[in-house]
Amino acid sequence: SVGITMNLENQEWNTFLNTRKAGDYSVARNGWVADYNDPICFLDMWISSSGNNDVQFGKGDHATVKAYSLDLTPYGLDTKVENGTWAETYDVLISAIKSCTDNDNRYAMMHIAEDMLMDTGCIVPLYFYTDIYMLDDSVHGFFSNPLGYKYFYKCDVDGKTDSINVCIASEPDVLDPALNSAVDGATLDSHLFAGLAKWDTSADGKLEIVADCAESLPEGVVNEDGTVTYTYTLRDGLKWSDGQDLKASDFVFAWKRAASEELGADYGYMFENVKGYPNDLAVEATDDKTIVVTLNNAVAYWDELLAFPAYFPVREDVVANEGWCTDASTFVSNGAYKMTGWDHNSVITLTKNDHYWDAENVTMKEIKFYLSDDTNNMLTNFKNGDWLLIDEVPTNEIATLKTEYPTEFVVAGQIGTYYVCWNINENLLP
């Protein structure tokens, strides 16, 4: 015996999510799915200001611990720290990686960040994600992306487009796109909102990032100081689901809100590449159709960020109502669908939004997202034909399902990893 008492607890997902955010745990089996196609998204979540930093690096008592060293002089930077805090070393390292335009140096510094994380002993990678789901053979036009988001707007059910019933998860924690930090919430938000860019499939079925509310996704202009400026023109006639005009200023408000220290969003750091982050973002609406944003430096995955929920627009007068995103009657969005029903812990109903700029290419008229985390219940409804997609199956049924449903049992690639994490502020030794 080592004299340690261990209490094991299996929590419902949203409870587990908030327990980890609050640091109210000692050890947890965790997972992370990429937010865009670049390794930095597995590293920047551990900076001290990140809301996704469940290990609590640089938070609480750990904020003042001086135990870390950093030397970036081999990469042409005037940074050398001995016995510094997490913020003085790891946070500085991540910032340097994000501003680095030399690919070799950038990857070398990412290896340093990985080594720093592993040396703490607080993160133990287990295995990589695969996205397992069941999709009925009658469904056509469905696609998912490497981040795990599911898309139904192009679907038909053996040619019928009236409605589709699916189950991707239980009750979402939050559907405010600035505050969401879960894959199921991102799937819902990606149907309800439209950013400057979106994930789509080409004619040959390949995934791609394409313009959504923006007319196009132009190249940035490199300024003399190394910053990069992008100018986006919105499509004509953009509207919110309640019929009001959508303006460039709505994007500016949404981005500044999402990045602000006042909101304290988990994904606020996703705007770190924008000049003036966090409280003075260099983004402006020069007129109702034009958005100008300046980045600190070139960012290879910038277009992917524009398709990420944190970059979706919200309207200032709508979000002034604190409970706006918890009820269909107050939920205002600008995407392919509008919310027309939310029976909490039962079902969320999305109906085609005729105000969406590309509504003529939205095939499915209604999507019912049934809410459950009971995998046996999910499988029963799939077998009965009631739910045409379920995003999880009972582990003990996998071998059987592979055999009995060879075309409907899907194992898709996903950019993510499972790991065990320790709360760095917990003293676990007796």
Can you say where each PLM-predicted feature lies in the sequence?
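Ligand-site clamp/hinge motif
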Residues: T5-N7, E12, H355-T400
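Aromatic- and charge-enriched surface segment that lines or borders ligand/interaction sites
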Residues: E215-A265, V292, N381
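N-terminal lobe/hinge region of extracytoplasmic solute-binding protein
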Residues: C167-V222, V332
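Gly/Pro-rich hinge or "lid" segments in bacterial periplasmic/extracellular proteins
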Residues: V183, T187-S190, A194, K198-D204, ...
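Alpha-helical secondary-structure segments
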Residues: T101-D119, N165, K247-A254, D288-T294, ...
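Detector for C-terminal structural segments
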Residues: L17-P172, V183-H191, D343
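A bilobed periplasmic-binding-protein/Venus flytrap-type ligand-binding module shared by bacterial periplasmic
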Residues: Y129-T130, W199-D200, R235, T351-H355, ...
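Surface-exposed binding/hinge segments that line
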Residues: T231-T233, Y267-D317
